[in-house]
Every structure is written in C-alpha cells, then in structure tokens.
C-alpha cells in the first residue's frame, strides 16, 4: 500500500459522509495494523509529515499509531509494547521517531500536538529499555530561549505527556530529571514572553514533579524552582496563574516535608490574598492548595496514630491558618452558580470540599468561625447566604467530637428543617444534603421524639420536589436507616410504611433526571436489607411493587422505542433487579413458590437482543436466587448453563467477573453436589485466568472462587490441586507492574484472593492431610508474606483468615510432621500482634488465641 492510499484510508475513516465507507476504511486500517504492523507504523509516520495530505488525515495518522502503542488496558499495553519491540526493525523505528520529531516542530499546532502524543507513546516503551537516549537532549535543545515559540510549546507538551503516562517509579525519567527540569524551567520562568510556552511548561512541571525528587531534596534547586512557580502565580494571564497554583498543589502533596520555610516566607500570604481573586478559576486553585494541605496533614495524623515511631512530622499549617483561611472559604461559599441545574464544578463547591477537610483536620477548632457564619446567614434575605450557611453547617459534620456536634445539631436542626420549604431550589437541595450529612455522621443527635418525625416529613416532602432535592432525600433516608437500624429498639421502623410509600412514589417517576429515580430504588434496596419482622407487611409491599414494575417493563414493545427511551428502560430494569435481588436474599424461605416464575423472567431478560446493559444485574439476581434455594437451584442449571458459559467467555467484559462470582454462589449452594459440575467449571476457569485478553480483575476473582469450590467438594478437589497451587504460587510471587497506587492496590487484591484460595483448600482437605502436606511450606511462605506487609496484616478480615489458616493447618497434623513451621519467630510474633492489636475485632482476636493454642500443641509434639 502506498502512502497516498494509506492517507486516503485515514481521510475516508473520518471525513467521508458515507457511513459504510467510514466503517470499511476503519476495518481496513485495523486489519493492516494486525497483519503487518511494521508497514502500518511506517505509513502512519510518513502520512504525519506529508503536507499533501489533509490536516485531519495527518492528525489521525499520529493518533491512530499512538493508540496502537498504548492502551488504558495494561494487558494490551504490554502486548503493544512487545509488538513494537519485536516487529519493528531498528531502521524503521529510527525513521518513525525522526518523522514524529519533524512533526513536533510543525507550525501547525494540531499536528504538533498529535506528534507530542505519539512521541510520548514511543518513549513510554523505549525509555525503560534504555532506547532513544538522545530524546531528552533533543527536548532540552528544543526549549532553549533561541527556539521559536511553536517548537518550545510542542516540546514541553511532549515532555508533559511523557511524564503523565510513565510509571511513577520509572528510572529512565528519574535519571533524566536534570534535563527535564532544565527544559521546564526554561519555559516557565518569568523571562519567557509567550503565554503558550509558559503554560505548557507549568503543565509539564505538574506531571514531572514525581520524577524530580533528587532535585527537590537539594535546597538550592528547590529554592529556584519554588521561586519560578511563585512568580508564575503573579502572572497577568489567568491560565498561567491557575497552572502555577496547580503546581503548588502537587508540590505540597509530594514534598510537604520541605514546605515549612516556603509557607512562612511566601505561600501563606500569597494564597490568602489570592483566595479573594475575582476570577473563580484562580480562587478555586488556591482553595485546592489548602485542601491539599489538609489531606496531607490528615494522612500524617493517621500514619502517626498507626505507627508512632514514624519520622513524619505535621507542621499544622491548617490549624494555624483557621482565622485567615476559613473566613475566606465561608465567603467563597456564596459564589454559587446562578442556574440551579448547573452542576459544573465551581469555586463555591471547592470551598465546601475544603471546609470539610478543615473540619476533619482541625476538629473542634473549626466550630467557632463556622457556627458564627451559620447564625448570621441562615435566615438572610439573599438565597446565596442561606444556602452557604446550610452548606457550611453540613460541611463540619465530620471532624469535631460527637458531643459538640450533637449539641449544635440540637440547636440548628429546626431552622435547617424549615429551609426544606424555601423558595430557592439551591437552598432546598443543599438542605436535603445537610440533613443527609447529619444522618450519616451523627445520627444519634436526631432525637426520636423531638427531631426524627420532622426529618422524615422533610424527606417525604423532598421526594416529591425537584429531582435534585429528591435525590438527596433518598440518600438521607439511606443514611437514617443504616445508622438508626442498629439501635434497640430502633425508632426508624415506626416510619417504615411512610418512607416506603414515599420512595415507591419517587421510584415511579417517568424519568431519571438527576438520578432521582435510581436513588429512590437504591433507598428501597436499603429498606429491604435492614427490614425486620416488625415491618414484614411493608417489606412485602416493596416486593409487590418491584415485581409489578418488572412485569410492566417486560410488556413494553422495545421495537417502538427511541434509543434514549430504550436506554431509560434498561436503566429502570437494572434498578428493579437490584431491589429484587435484595428481596430474594432477605426472604429466602418465601422464594421457592415463585422461583420458576422468577427464572422465567430472568431468562427472558437474558434473551433480549440488547441484554448486555442489564446482564450483570440479572446474574446478580440469579445469584441471590441460587443462594436462597440452595440445592434446589440445581434444576435450573442445565437451562442456565449456556448463558453462564457465554458470560464466562466474555473475558473482557465486567459480566465475566459477575459470572465467576455466580460460580462461587452455586458451589456454596450445591455444596458437595457441585462435584458433578466441577470438571467443566474448573476447565473454564483455568482458560479464563490464562487468557491474555482477560480483564485483570478476573485473576483475583478466579483465584478466590477456587477456594469456594475446594471447600465445598472436599477430597474431589485433589485432582486439580497441583495445577491450582501452581497458579497460586505464581500469583503470590508476581510483583506490581509499576509503582502506581492502582497497580499496588491490584497486587493487594491478588494476594487477598490467594489467601481466599488457601483458606478454601485447607478447609476442603481437612480430612486429607496427606494431600495438603507437600504444599504446607508454600502456604507458610505466603502467610509470612502477609505478616510482613502492613497493607495486608492491618486488615481485620485478612489477618483473621491468615492466623486462622495457621491454626487450621496445625489441627490437620497432630503427628508433629509439620512442627518445624510453628517454631519460627515470625509465626509467634504475628499471632501475638493479631491477638493484642487494638484495631482488630474480637472475632479476629479470638481466632488468634485459638491459633496460639494450636501452635503450642504443635510445639509440644
């Protein structure tokens, strides 16, 4: 294929008025990428610099190639990187990179922008492998003072993209930090006359800060960088100012420990003054700066509470700033959007979020200035002041001690409830939110006789109001039920009939504007989950409502619906199924007579041509039915199996994870009878976990379900044991793919799933110790890993399972054959820590005591 032909394909795929031509062109491009990536990549880079090709085609060439190098899916990104490394020759790589760098300095900004993204994608693959070593020098040279504006801007943009997409622990970028910093500072300093260059430099700085730790640790370099950023906050251009404050937020987040002198010398006064800026964007960024300070100090306080020996130190910036910052925040609360239906983030919302963080950080110290503001404004003539007062009160419901909050809620609640009848929609919406905050954070302050009837009445009125008010009222009801249901006796059940009637009315809305209908269904789900026998009749009315509602949706002729109406119907069915699943789980004994009818409805829903949207919810409801019926569900398995296998095979879809969870539910329902299906299910699960295209969330889901199956089929799991243990060992030994929080969290999920698997395997083989014996050492190695990782051992459920495993294994081997494992220092220490840990539940401490007894028996053998 020639460059001209390839360019024509690109142009057709985006510019052709004929949809068939567009689709055909896209298909041909994808086919070429799959069949001959070397040619595809080369042609893309040639079109990018071909000035005879239309602008849109050139831009698309860069972006299409970029999208074949990186993906939001980490598995695909690894596959793309391997393809680039193995299928593209060194000569071709050099030519593609040369073409990308040529396009980067184009005077057409859209070409340069696309090239910057392409360069970052290539760098993301090459730099970690030590390739393209000259790139950083090129970037520095491109940002020199003598370079044209367009070259500097585009090169800084590329640097920002590189840093944004890279692994935070990338040694390639850390080792290039000097060059990165030189390039950025050249563009960010006040001597740079171009706004576009300065803005690009500041944005790149925000993305690069994590890689310049070594530079920030050197006082001279840190001082100079802080000077450049502080000067930028005083620029005449609003965008540059806002970007500079964005950098200060990131600097405070990453380098809090160095910030004391800068706060004292400049940042404190600078940010206080700038909070009064008439420009909302700049004021918002300044508020964000103080939010960042609060977040850091909250984290430090938590760290010091958990680990008193930690070297971290809090400078209490927020606490010492209350008298200056909080009054400004309170004033900013009155700068709301004029349009009550405008939900765009604004400076008022930023101030409210910041006030919440100040309350969490400073506790009772926040009360005086806020309550004074509330008292002065809650009955003001201007709706902005009334709304701000209610927002301020709701924002301090988490932080000060409960005695103080309870006292002030008693005083303020009558006035707040009155505002549910306000003429201003904004005031009513925020009032409903404020009541929800009270119910969530300090529900015990709502006196059952004095306040609760008024709160419930306010919610019932709000459910019939504007959708935004109704949504907040549903949330308030959820909080009331969750927080008050545990009381003995609970006052909330007296109001169940009225609340359910109100929610059913809201759930019958014809639309879901501002999520009002869905919120009502969520509240109904909560009502079901917390219902007791005293409100059985009311619970039955929810069951009747959702069954009738589901029947109504099933009778709709979907062929006559517009796309928007069809989506609304699917959304409604999803909401109904969520409540129905809760009803089924809550009343398992009443399910059997209607099980055939329910399964018939579920099969009809799965048969719909566009069932993908609700498939997950249908599976969740069927799981609830399986759990309720127990072994009685087996009669549906033959009919249901094709749907289950279809879902399991959709390894790139969330429904596959739900389907895996369904297997766990089925194995728990059928117990030992699940052995009849274990061969087929284990085969499918093994294929899923080894599929390179599978969603990565599948791995922990599948590992965990192995434990469910093992615990239920017992000795019949032995034929799979060797293969499953190999998978578990591989999983427990894998390292995070990078240093991002997402990657670290995923690794924790995988390790927790391995623990689930081991717990199930040990439980299932309790009568077959000889089968487990070869793997005891492996399991103990894993428990040691848990005992050493604070992210694992600090979790109550995780430590309970791990020490329980130590005890369970000991009980299986009363002959002393595994005695050597129980004398290890870490075993003694871990059991002791778990038994005496203040943060652990009594159940976990009891499990640790039992494990200690089992350990002592082992050592006495």
UniProtKB/Swiss-Prot annotation:
Additional comments on file? Binds to nucleoporin FxFG but not GLFG repeat regions. Ran-GTP can disrupt the importin alpha/beta heterodimer by binding to the beta subunit and releases both subunits from the docking site. The stoichiometric complex between importin beta and Ran-GTP renders the latter inaccessible to Ran-specific GTPase activating protein (Ran-GAP) thereby inhibiting GTP hydrolysis stimulated by Ran-GAP.
Q: Which UniProt keywords apply?
A: Acetylation, Cytoplasm, mRNA transport, Nuclear pore complex, Nucleus, Phosphoprotein, Protein transport, Repeat, Translocation, Transport
What is this protein's record name? Importin subunit beta-1
The family database entries (PANTHER family) matched by this protein are listed as: IMPORTIN BETA
PROSITE patterns from the xrefs? HEAT_REPEAT, IMPORTIN_B_NT
Q: According to the UniProt record, list the residues that bear N-acetylserine.
A: 2
Q: Name one Pfam family in it.
A: HEAT_EZ
What gene codes for this chain? KAP95
Give compartment(s). Cytoplasm; Nucleus; Nucleus, Nuclear pore complex
Please explain the role this protein plays, according to its UniProt record: Importin beta subunit that functions in nuclear protein import through association with the importin alpha subunit, which binds to the classical nuclear localization signal (cNLS) in cargo substrates. Docking of the importin/substrate complex to the nuclear pore complex (NPC) is mediated by importin beta through binding to nucleoporin FxFG repeats and the complex is subsequently translocated through the pore by an energy requiring, Ran-dependent mechanism. At the nucleoplasmic side of the NPC, GTP-Ran binds to importin beta and the three components separate, leading to release of the cargo.
- What organism is listed for this UniProt entry? Saccharomyces cerevisiae (strain ATCC 204508 / S288c)
């Amino acid at each position: 294929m020639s460059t001209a032909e390839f360019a024509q394909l690109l142009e057709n795929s985006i510019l052709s008025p004929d949809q068939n031509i567009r689709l055909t062109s896209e298909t041909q491009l994808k086919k070429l990428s799959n069949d001959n990536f070397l040619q595809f990549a080369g042609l893309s880079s040639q079109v990018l610099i071909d000035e005879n090709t239309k602008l849109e085609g050139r831009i698309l060439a860069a972006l299409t190639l970029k999208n074949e190098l990186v993906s939001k899916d980490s598995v695909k990104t690894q596959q793309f990187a391997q393809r680039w490394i193995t299928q593209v020759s060194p000569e071709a790589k050099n030519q593609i990179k040369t073409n990308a760098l040529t396009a980067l300095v184009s005077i057409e900004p859209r070409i340069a922008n696309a090239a910057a993204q392409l360069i970052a994608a290539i760098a993301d693959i090459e730099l970690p492998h030590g390739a393209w070593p000259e790139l950083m020098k090129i970037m520095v040279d491109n940002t020199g003072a003598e370079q044209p504006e367009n070259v500097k801007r585009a090169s800084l943009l590329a640097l920002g993209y590189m840093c944004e997409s890279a692994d935070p622990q990338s040694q390639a970028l850390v080792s290039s930090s000097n060059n990165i910093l030189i390039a950025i500072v050249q563009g960010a300093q006040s001597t740079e006359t171009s706004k576009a260059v300065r803005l690009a430099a500041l944005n790149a700085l925000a993305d690069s800060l994590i890689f310049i730790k070594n530079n920030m640790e050197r006082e001279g370099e840190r001082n100079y960088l802080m000077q450049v950023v502080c000067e930028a906050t005083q620029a005449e251009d609003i965008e540059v100012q806002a970007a500079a404050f964005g950098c200060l937020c990131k600097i405070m987040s990453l380098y809090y420990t160095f910030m004391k002198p800068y706060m004292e010398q400049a940042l404190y006064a600078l940010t206080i003054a700038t909070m009064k800026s008439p420009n909302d964007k700049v004021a918002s960024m300044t508020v964000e700066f103080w939010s960042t300070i609060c977040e850091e100090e909250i984290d430090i306080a938590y760290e010091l509470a958990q680990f008193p020996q930690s070297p971290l130190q809090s400078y209490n910036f927020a606490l010492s700033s209350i008298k200056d910052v909080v009054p400004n925040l309170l004033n900013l609360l009155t700068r709301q959007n004029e349009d009550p239906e405008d939900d765009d983030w604004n400076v008022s919302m930023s101030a409210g979020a910041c006030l919440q963080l100040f309350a969490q950080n400073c506790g009772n110290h926040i009360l005086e200035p806020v309550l004074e503001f509330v008292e002065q404004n809650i009955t003001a003539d201007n709706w902005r002041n009334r709304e701000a007062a209610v927002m301020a009160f709701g924002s301090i419901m988490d932080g000060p001690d409960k005695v103080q909050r309870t006292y002030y809620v008693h005083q303020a609640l009558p006035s707040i409830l009155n505002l549910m009848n306000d003429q201003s929609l904004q005031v009513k919406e925020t009032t409903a939110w404020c009541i929800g905050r009270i119910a969530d954070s300090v529900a015990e302050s709502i006196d059952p006789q004095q306040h609760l009837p008024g709160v419930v009445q306010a919610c019932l009125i709000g459910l019939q109001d504007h959708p935004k008010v109704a949504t907040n009222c549903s949330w308030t009801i959820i909080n009331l039920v969750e927080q008050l249901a545990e009381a003995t006796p609970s006052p909330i059940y007296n109001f169940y009939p009225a609340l359910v009637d109100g929610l059913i009315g809201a759930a019958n809305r014809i639309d879901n504007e501002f999520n009002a209908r869905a919120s009502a269904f969520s509240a109904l789900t909560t009502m079901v989950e917390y219902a007791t026998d005293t409100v059985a009749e009311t619970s039955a009315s929810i069951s009747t409502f959702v069954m009738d509602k589901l029947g109504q949706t099933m009778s709709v002729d979907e062929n006559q619906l517009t796309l928007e109406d069809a989506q609304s119907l699917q959304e409604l069915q999803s909401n109904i199924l969520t409540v129905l699943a809760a009803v089924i789980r809550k009343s398992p004994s009443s399910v059997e007579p209607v099980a055939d009818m329910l399964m018939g409805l579920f099969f009809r829903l799965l048969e719909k041509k566009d069932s993908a949207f609700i498939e997950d919810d249908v599976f969740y409801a069927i799981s609830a039915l399986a759990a309720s019926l127990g072994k009685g569900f087996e009669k549906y398995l033959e009919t249901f199996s094709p749907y289950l296998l279809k879902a399991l095979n959709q390894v790139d879809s969330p429904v596959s994870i739900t389907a895996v969870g369904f297997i766990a539910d089925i194995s728990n329902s059928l117990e030992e009878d699940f052995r009849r299906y274990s061969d087929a299910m284990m085969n499918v699960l093994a294929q899923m976990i080894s599929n390179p295209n599978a969603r990565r969330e599948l791995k922990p889901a599948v590992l965990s379900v192995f434990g469910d199956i093992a615990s239920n089929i017992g000795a019949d799991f032995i034929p799979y044991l060797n293969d499953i243990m190999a998978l578990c060992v591989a999983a427990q030994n894998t390292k995070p793919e990078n240093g991002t929080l997402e990657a670290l969290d995923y690794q924790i999920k995988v390790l927790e799933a391995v623990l689930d698997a081991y717990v199930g395997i040990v439980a299932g083989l309790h009568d077959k110790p000889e089968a487990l014996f070869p793997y005891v050492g492996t399991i103990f190695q894993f428990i040691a890993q848990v005992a050493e990782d604070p992210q694992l051992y600090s979790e109550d459920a995780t430590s309970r399972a791990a020490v329980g495993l130590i005890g369970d294994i000991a009980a299986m081997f009363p002959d002393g054959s595994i005695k050597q494992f129980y004398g290890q220092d870490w075993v003694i220490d871990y059991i002791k820590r778990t038994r005496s840990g203040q943060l652990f539940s009594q159940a976990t401490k009891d499990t640790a005591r039992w494990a200690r007894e089992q350990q002592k028996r082992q050592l006495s053998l």
